[in-house]
UniProtKB/Swiss-Prot annotation:
Homodimer. NCBIfam families: lysS_bact, PRK00484.1. Its EC number is 6.1.1.6. InterPro entries: Aa-tRNA-synt_II, aa-tRNA-synth_II, aa-tRNA-synth_II/BPL/LPL, Lys-tRNA-ligase_II, Lys-tRNA-ligase_II_N, Lys-tRNA-synth_II_C, NA-bd_OB-fold, NA-bd_OB_tRNA. Its main location: cytoplasm. GO terms for molecular function: ATP binding; lysine-tRNA ligase activity; magnesium ion binding; tRNA binding. This is Lysine--tRNA ligase. Its cofactor is Mg(2+). GO terms for cellular component: cytosol. SUPFAM superfamilies: Class II aaRS and biotin synthetases, Nucleic acid-binding proteins. The gene is lysS. Binds 3 Mg(2+) ions per subunit. Mg(2+) 1 binds at E407, E414. PANTHER family: LYSINE--TRNA LIGASE, CHLOROPLASTIC_MITOCHONDRIAL, LYSYL-TRNA SYNTHETASE.
Length: 498
């Protein structure tokens, strides 16, 4: 407890002291939480405007700034005031500051938000400073800030109380500023490529476009069970059918009622786009241009660090077929295997446990995940996926078990997934029926055919290339963030016990 706190008869408990100061402030000045405050410059604008001011010089100009008090020295004579753009020093001298400003100083705690009007000067040590002539209390903080020099180290508290994390950890603040810049750059890139942005339903009566467990809800007025979408694909394809645009995209949230990990959050951001009269080869080029553009937006170059790795987003990226990659890793030539049982036996011979009813394509994909995926550090396109696991992609000519699909990998993570989209309505129906039967076999009895989507396909959809990008994972790479929770402002967490 400070001498001034003791003199004022305040409690020794930090939180109680703040509440008592709030009561005193209400008595002294009335409104402690005013609705409006006019500042003339942000801290960054002030620093830029007076960058040429020499040490030990007064500007002769008065400004008004506002922000949160982060440090206080010499009984409040010096304070560091932070706004979203940066820091400025505030000086209040007992001999020069007006009485009203001096009287307010003992009531100011770290974390309070104040407004300051005064003359700009640069100290002998070169610190840009505002000499306070007027101080306005804008928001009295009732809780102490985390300790200045150690920041907010506890990882759980950082995720649960993100506002504190950003308040005191400059690295976290920068990361979320970068996230905003990346999403803006992604949107601008797609618009420059001629794509039109749309918004499709989050609540869907039939979930589809991916294989995942949905979140279920109920619409009371419509008396209808609905699902938070797992993907926007089937609605975006309806737009291609409509002729509204030949290039469409959406950046929005998907929801999957599945596991949580350093790479998975049940609510996540996806970019999906569809490009009429293009195929997966065209989309590979689009991905390479996109990655290069985003790296330049964040780093000013295409090479950057992720952990102990040096990554390069400079295209073109290598391309490898899934069967070839698995053959290189295991020696198994899947194209020479003719049946599901041959594939399962080959996996068992390689020491890999496989489900007893796994298909040829499922075995191939599983071995890829187990033996190849983690080795793909630099960006690479893995092409020619099994048709068994790709119900919306066109077959590879001459190899009916494979489809024109690729996934883009980096750091061993899947970042993008793309197809030459299937537009044969008869084949599409057959594959979706098969997909529904497989879902029912897994116990997903609510899975049904989206007949409206199939009607749209019967109307005719142009050939197209489609792409989905996991925006969160891409941001993780570009911001050197090892966990998806580091780049989602408010990640899903288990409820904290009382």
């Amino acid at each position: 407890m400070t001498d001034k706190t003791q003199a004022a008869g305040l409690s020794s408990d930090a939180t109680e002291v703040r509440s008592q100061k709030l009561d005193l402030l209400r008595q002294q000045i009335g409104d402690v939480y005013p609705a409006h405050f006019h500042r003339t410059l942000t801290n960054a604008e002030l620093a830029e405007k007076y960058a040429g001011l020499e040490p030990d010089t007064e500007s002769g100009e008065t400004v008004t700034v506002a922000g949160r008090v982060f440090s206080s020295r010499n009984s409040g004579m010096f304070m560091d005031l932070h706004d979203a753009s940066g820091k400025i020093q505030i000086f209040s001298h007992k001999d020069t500051a007006p009485e009203e400003a001096r009287a307010l100083l003992p009531m100011i705690d770290l974390g309070d938000i104040i407004g300051v009007t005064g003359e700009v000067r640069r100290t002998k040590r070169g610190e840009l400073t505002v000499n306070a002539k007027e101080i306005t209390m804008l928001c009295k903080s009732l809780l102490p800030m985390p300790e200045k020099y150690h920041g907010l180290a506890d990882i759980e508290t950082r995720y649960r109380k993100r506002y504190l994390d950003i308040m005191v950890n400059e690295e976290s603040k920068l990361r979320f500023q970068q996230r905003s810049r990346i999403v803006s750059s992604l949107r601008r890139f797609l618009e420059d490529e001629g794509f039109m942005e749309v918004e499709t339903p989050m609540l869907q009566p039939i979930y589809g476009g991916a294989t995942a467990e949905p979140f279920k809800t109920h619409h009371n007025t419509l008396k209808l069970d609905m699902y938070l979408r797992i993907a926007p694909e089937l609605y975006l394809k309806r737009i291609l059918v409509s002729g509204l645009t030949d290039k469409v995209f959406e950046i929005n949230r998907n929801f999957r009622n599945e596991g949580v990990s350093t790479r998975h959050n049940p609510e996540f951001t996806m970019m999906e786009c569809y490009w009429a009269y293009a195929d997966y080869e065209d989309v590979m080029g689009l991905v390479e241009r996109m990655f290069e553009t985003l790296a330049l937006a964040v780093h000013g170059k295409t090479e950057f660090e992720f952990g102990d790795k040096q990554l390069s987003f400079k295209g073109p990226f290598p391309r490898v077929s899934m069967p070839a990659a698995v053959k290189d890793a295991t020696g198994i030539d899947f194209l020479a295997l003719k049946s599901d049982e041959e594939a399962r036996q080959a996996a068992r011979d390689a020491g890999v446990e496989i489900e007893k009813d796994a298909t040829w394509g499922e075995v191939l994909a599983f071995l890829f995940e187990e033996k190849v995926e983690a080795t793909l550090i630099q960006p690479a396109h893995v092409i020619h996926f099994p048709k068994d696991i790709s119900p919306f992609a066109k077959e590879v000519p001459g190899e009916p078990r494979l489809v024109e699909r690729f996934e883009t990998y980096c750091n061993g993570w899947e970042i993008g997934n793309a197809f030459s989209e299937l537009n044969d309505p008869v084949e599409q129906r057959a594959r979706m029926v098969e997909q529904m039967e497989q879902a029912h076999a897994r116990g997903e009895k609510e899975k049904t055919l989206d007949e409206d989507f199939l009607d749209a396909m019967d109307q005719g959809m142009p050939p197209a290339g489609g792409l989905g990008i996991g925006v969160d994972r891409l941001i993780m790479l570009l911001t050197n963030s090892p966990s998806i929770r580091d780049i989602i402002l408010f990640p899903a967490r288990r409820q904290k016990a009382d």
